């Protein structure tokens, strides 16, 4: 079984906890993700209190190597990336994780 939480699982969990129709929950979850994606695409940070912050940052131009031709240097242009900073409550919850189970 995968260790990933999918959008479908989020929809089903909300449906089970609230009893709202799955189509409405699916639409609401998708709308939320669309709003977050649009804000990030505009260069805005997204702050979700007690969870974390999605920050748009610029990754500088750098020199990389082609794995097929290690002698050839490749210029990797600067680009925008999204970085996640966990909030205080999430950090506390992560400290309680069983790291041995996580690595298995």
Regions inferred by a protein language model and the residue ranges of each:
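Strongly charged
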Residues: 1-104
